[in-house]
Amino acid sequence: MSKKRLSNQVKTWRFLAQEMTQSELGEKVGVTRQTIAAIEAGKYSPSLECAFRIAEVLGRPLEDVFQWEA
């Protein structure tokens, strides 16, 4: 079984969402700025609920924001 990892475009979509800050996104999602920073850096994989909330706040489908890569 090959090792896959979760990648994301949170930073890109956050910037395109009127240059939303990490703090603003975190507040709307219900997590800290540090959590958003860790997700963007690929150091933390969000829960499924958190991933859906991020996509919803950014106004994008989940698959536009998060990708499962080999």
Regions found by a protein language model. Name each.
Residues 19-38:
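Short alpha-helical DNA-recognition segment
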Residues 64-70:
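Short amphipathic recognition helices of helix-turn-helix/homeodomain-type DNA-binding modules
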Residues 8, 19-20, 46-49:
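Residue-level signal for the short linker/turn that defines the boundary of a DNA-recognition helix
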Residues 15, 30, 41, 70:
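Residue-level detection of the helix-turn-helix DNA-binding "recognition helix"
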Residues 1-18:
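A short, Lys/Arg-rich alpha-helix, primarily the initiator
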Residues 49-64:
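DNA major-groove recognition helix of helix-turn-helix/homeodomain DNA-binding modules
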Residues 14, 26, 55:
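The alpha-helix within a helix-turn-helix
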Residues 11-12, 23, 52:
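Residues within the helices of the helix-turn-helix
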